[in-house]
């Protein structure tokens, strides 16, 4: 009991520190929820959350430009959002545990850029800075992600940059989503493909 109480108090203190970066209604942040700001900007709102939403996830903002928006009455389980650009999750969305939503490539396709990336990380780290404090993002492809209302993302999925998950769409567990998923369909696999179209009686009117 005492250990659980300690964990709860520590989480509350962490959430209070992070509150300057968050705009939210009456939504709830579970004790395991966390935000990692690799290059924090003190006067910026990084995360906007609507009402009646539950967040039990980890969000990493790779740069000052990142922004995550979550709508009303959504649930994000123990998943990881990695944002440099923009990730939008609309209303009534379920995201299960173990999924990763990633709006950029992290590194260039050119090996020479990656070599310089490693050297710059070492320089920054040895100076006591964030290891990506001076990362060259200009050579890294990044595109926003949109997950529309009433979608459901199963466990252990990977959603990559530039993807739109359509309204009411379902992504099966363990899928790797590299392309858009149409409204009211079920997609699965690696890479994810549409495997079923939901009937009219399962669609929102």
PLM segments and residue spans:
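Domain-scale signature associated with acetyltransferase and cell-envelope carbohydrate enzymes
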Residues: 1-150, 156-159, 167, 183, ...
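Extracellular carbohydrate recognition
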Residues: 163
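A generic "structured core" feature
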Residues: 166, 170, 175-176
